[in-house]
C-alpha cells in the first residue's frame, strides 16, 4: 500500500487571460496569482516530510507552477502526467469565456457528473476523469518499491473523481492510500 498525496494547484490568475481575450483551452496557460504562489509554498511545506519518492503533475501552467514549489521542498524532479489534466468542460474546445464554462459545470452537476442515458454532452463525464486519473496513480503506486509515498499535483475535478470529495481548496492536500483508488 502506498500513500498518495493529492494536491490541488494554487489559485490561478484567469483575469490575466481574460484581459488578453484568449478563448478556450488557452485559459490553461494562466499562471498562479500571488495568493496561489503562497498556497503552493504552504503545500510544499506540508509535504516536506511525507517521504515522497515521486512527484507527478498535470501539464497545465497552474499545476506545474504549484509542483515547482513543492519540488523545492521535497527535492524531487517533476514527472508530467498528461492524464492528470483538468476535466474537459467542452471536448470541442470551443468555449470562449468563464460564463460558458460555468454553464457547462452547472449542467455537469445537474446530471450528477455523468451523461444522461442515451444522451451525449460536450463535457467529460466524471467516470472518464476517474478512469484516466486512477490509472496514472495506480501505475505510479505500482512502481514504488521499498516504501515511500507519491505526490500528485492536479485539479479539483481529478481529486473529486478519485476521492468523492466535491470541494477542495486551492493548495489543499488530501491523502489517500493506493488501495482506496477506484
List the predicted regions and their residue ranges.
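Phosphate-handling substructures
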Residues: 26-31, 72-132
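Active-site-adjacent alpha-helix immediately C-terminal to a catalytic or transition-state-stabilizing loop
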Residues: 134-182
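Generic structural signal for well-ordered alpha-helical scaffold segments
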Residues: 41-48, 130, 134-142
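Active-site-proximal alpha-helix that buttresses catalytic centers in soluble enzyme cores
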Residues: 2-80
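Short, active-site-adjacent cap segments at secondary-structure transitions
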Residues: 13, 63-64, 86-88, 158-160
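Short aromatic-enriched loop/helix-cap "lid" or pocket-rim segments at secondary-structure transitions
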Residues: 15-20, 90-94, 165
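Residues at the C-termini of beta-strands that transition into short coil/loop
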Residues: 8, 82-84, 177-180
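Short, well-ordered beta-to-alpha junction loops that form the rim of enzyme active sites
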Residues: 57-61, 83, 153-157
Amino acid at each position: 500500500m502506498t500513500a498518495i498525496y493529492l494536491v490541488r494547484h494554487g489559485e490561478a490568475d484567469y483575469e490575466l487571460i481574460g484581459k488578453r481575450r484568449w478563448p478556450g483551452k488557452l485559459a490553461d496557460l494562466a499562471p498562479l496569482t500571488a495568493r496561489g504562489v503562497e498556497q503552493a509554498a504552504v503545500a510544499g511545506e506540508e509535504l516536506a516530510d511525507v517521504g515522497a519518492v515521486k512527484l507527478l503533475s498535470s501539464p497545465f501552467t497552474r499545476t506545474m507552477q504549484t509542483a515547482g514549489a513543492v519540488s523545492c521542498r521535497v527535492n524531487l524532479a517533476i514527472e508530467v502526467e498528461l492524464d492528470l489534466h483538468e476535466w474537459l468542460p467542452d471536448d470541442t474546445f470551443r468555449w470562449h469565456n468563464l460564463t460558458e464554462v460555468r454553464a457547462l459545470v452547472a449542467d455537469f452537476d445537474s446530471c450528477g457528473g455523468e451523461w444522461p442515458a442515451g444522451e451525449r454532452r460536450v463535457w467529460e463525464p466524471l467516470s472518464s476523469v476517474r478512469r484516466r486519473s486512477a490509472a496514472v496513480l495506480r501505475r505510479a503506486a505500482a512502481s514504488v518499491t521499498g516504501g515511500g509515498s507519491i505526490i500528485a499535483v492536479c485539479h479539483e475535478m481529478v481529486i473529486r473523481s478519485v476521492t468523492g470529495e466535491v470541494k477542495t481548496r486551492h493548495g489543499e492536500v488530501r491523502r489517500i492510500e493506493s488501495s482506496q483508488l477506484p
